[in-house]
C-alpha cells in the first residue's frame, strides 16, 4: 500500500488530470479560432441603402422648427451677399421632394452693363455657369455607387475604361517610382498625376509667349467631344507627376471620374435586370 502512495506522490488526483486536459483543449481551440479570425480577410459587409426619410416625409415650411431654420438661412445668405462685393448675383433655394420651401434671388443679372436699367435682376430662372461645381456631383455619385457595392475607391480606372492608358517617365528619380495603376481614389483626390487639361496646347514659344496655355480650344487644340478622344489624349502625354506624390488639379481626371460613374452604374443596374438601354 505504501509503495502505491509513493508512486502517486507529487501527481494530481486522476479527476484533476481530466480537468487539466479539458482546460488545455479549450484554450487551444480558442487560440486557434482567434488566430484564424485575425489572419483571415474580413468578409465584405452588406451596405444597406440610406433611408429615404425625406422623400416620404417631406419638410413643411410652416413647421416652427423648419420656419426658424429657414429664417436663419435667409439671414446668412443675405448677409454673405452684402459682405462680399465680388458676388454679382446669386440664387439660393432649399428644395424638398415636394418642391422648394425657400427661395431668394439677389443682385443684377448682367452686372457689367453700364446702364442700370439694362442690368435686369436675378430670378429663379437665371442661368449660371456651373463650372467646377459639377465635380461635387460626380464625387457624390461615386460615393453612392460605392455604398451600393457597384465600385470600390481603389479599383483601377482600366476596370471600367479598358481603353485607358497613361505614360510614366520624365522624372529625375524615375527608377524609384512605383508604376502602379491609377485608381478611382487618385482621380477623386487629384492625386493621379494628370495635368489639368487634355489635349495640351503647343507652348514652343514659352516663356516669350503664352500661346498654347489653358484648356482646349483656347490653347489651340481641339476640344475632345467624346470619351475616346479624352482617353487617347491622356495616353499621348506623360503624367505631370508620379501618381500619389502631390495633388495636381485635373479637369481631365474628373471627366474620367464621371465616365466611370456612368459605366459602374450601368453595370450595377444591368445586374439587377434594369434595361439600361431605355
Curated annotation (Swiss-Prot):
GO terms for cellular component: membrane. The keyword Glycoprotein applies. It is found in: Membrane. The keyword Hydrolase applies. It is a single-pass membrane protein. The structure of strobilurin A was used for the development of the major class of beta-methoxyacrylate agricultural fungicides since its beta-methoxyacrylate toxophore targets the Qo site of complex III of the mitochondrial electron transport chain and prevents adenosine triphosphate synthesis. Compounds such as azoxystrobin (Syngenta) and Kresoxim methyl (BASF) are among the most widely used fungicides worldwide. This class of antifungals are used as effective treatments against a broad range of destructive fungal plant pathogens and make significant contributions to food security. This is Beta-lactamase-like protein str5.
Amino acid at each position: 500500500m505504501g509503495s502505491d502512495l509513493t508512486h502517486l506522490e507529487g501527481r494530481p488526483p486522476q479527476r484533476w488530470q481530466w480537468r487539466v486536459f479539458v482546460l488545455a483543449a479549450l484554450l487551444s481551440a480558442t487560440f486557434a479560432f482567434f488566430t484564424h479570425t485575425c489572419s483571415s480577410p474580413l468578409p465584405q459587409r452588406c451596405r444597406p441603402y440610406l433611408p429615404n426619410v425625406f422623400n416620404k416625409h417631406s419638410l413643411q415650411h410652416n413647421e416652427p422648427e423648419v420656419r426658424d431654420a429657414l429664417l436663419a438661412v435667409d439671414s446668412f445668405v443675405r448677409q454673405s451677399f452684402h459682405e462680399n462685393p465680388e458676388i454679382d448675383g446669386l440664387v439660393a433655394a432649399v428644395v424638398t421632394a415636394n418642391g422648394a420651401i425657400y427661395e431668394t434671388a439677389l443682385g443684377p443679372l448682367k452686372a457689367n452693363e453700364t446702364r442700370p436699367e439694362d442690368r435686369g435682376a436675378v430670378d429663379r430662372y437665371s442661368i449660371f455657369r456651373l463650372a467646377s461645381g459639377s465635380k461635387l456631383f460626380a464625387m457624390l455619385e461615386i460615393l453612392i455607387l460605392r455604398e451600393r457595392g457597384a465600385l470600390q475607391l481603389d479599383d483601377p480606372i482600366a476596370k471600367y475604361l479598358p481603353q485607358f492608358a497613361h505614360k510614366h517617365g520624365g522624372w529625375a528619380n524615375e527608377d524609384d517610382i512605383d508604376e502602379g495603376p491609377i485608381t478611382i481614389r487618385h482621380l477623386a483626390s487629384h492625386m493621379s498625376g494628370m495635368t489639368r487639361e487634355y489635349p495640351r496646347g503647343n507652348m514652343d514659344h514659352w516663356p516669350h509667349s503664352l500661346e498654347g496655355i489653358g484648356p482646349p480650344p483656347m490653347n489651340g487644340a481641339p476640344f475632345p467631344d467624346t470619351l475616346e478622344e479624352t482617353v487617347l489624349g491622356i495616353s499621348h502625354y506623360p503624367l505631370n507627376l508620379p501618381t500619389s506624390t502631390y495633388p495636381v488639379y485635373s479637369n481631365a481626371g474628373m471627366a474620367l471620374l464621371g465616365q466611370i460613374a456612368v459605366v459602374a452604374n450601368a453595370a450595377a443596374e444591368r445586374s439587377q435586370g434594369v434595361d439600361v438601354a431605355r
